[in-house]
């Protein structure tokens, strides 16, 4: 897939709408008001967002999600915050490895989700990290260079 101009704000908006359809009880909001554009692979970026939302709901029991994108001189930062049970700090790095599953994960899963997230971040020349969220759960932070 080629790198094309992607409107990240619009991508997050669509992901939010689809998430509410998949999880009717979920409160999903988008923090970004300004348009954030970058060169990227839309399908891959969308996969990352959908994955973070699914993880938050299935494994963290999240009821609230906040999506955000910010652009700066350093590039673009996309964050997915949730109010779920969170991922213990000592496991935040390991869960990105293939087939790894966090000790707090509630349902069976392939354990491939976050490995795919890490792979997409790498393909975009950036990084993916799990952090503590201001909402009380987990924050997935995707930090990508704006241009490739």
Regions found by a protein language model. Give the residues of each.
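Short alpha-helical Gxxx[C/S/T] motif in the catalytic ATP-binding
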Residues: 113, 117
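Short helix-loop "hinge" at the ATP-lid/N-box region of the Bergerat-fold HATPase_c
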Residues: 56-60
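Short conserved segment of the HATPase_c
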Residues: 87-99
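Conserved catalytic submotifs in the C-terminal HATPase_c
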Residues: 4, 25-37, 135
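Short beta-strand/loop element within the Bergerat-fold HATPase_c
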Residues: 64-74
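Glycine-rich ATP-binding loops of the HATPase_c
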Residues: 125-131
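Acidic ATP/Mg2+-coordinating residue in the GHKL
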Residues: 82
């Amino acid at each position: 897939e080629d790198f094309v101009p992607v409107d990240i704000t619009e991508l997050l908006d669509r992901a939010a709408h689809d998430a509410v359809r998949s999880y009717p009880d979920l409160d999903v909001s988008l923090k970004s008001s300004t348009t954030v554009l970058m060169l990227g692979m839309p399908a891959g970026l969308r996969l990352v967002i959908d994955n973070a939302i699914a993880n938050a709901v299935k494994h963290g029991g999240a009821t609230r999600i906040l999506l955000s994108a910010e652009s700066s001189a350093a590039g673009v930062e996309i964050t997915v915050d949730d109010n779920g049970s969170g991922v213990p700090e000592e496991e935040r790095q390991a869960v990105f490895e293939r087939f790894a599953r966090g000790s707090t994960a509630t349902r069976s899963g392939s354990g491939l989700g976050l490995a795919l997230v890490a792979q997409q971040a790498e393909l975009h020349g950036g990084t993916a990290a799990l952090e503590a969220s201001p909402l009380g759960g987990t924050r997935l932070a995707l930090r990508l260079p704006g241009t490739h």
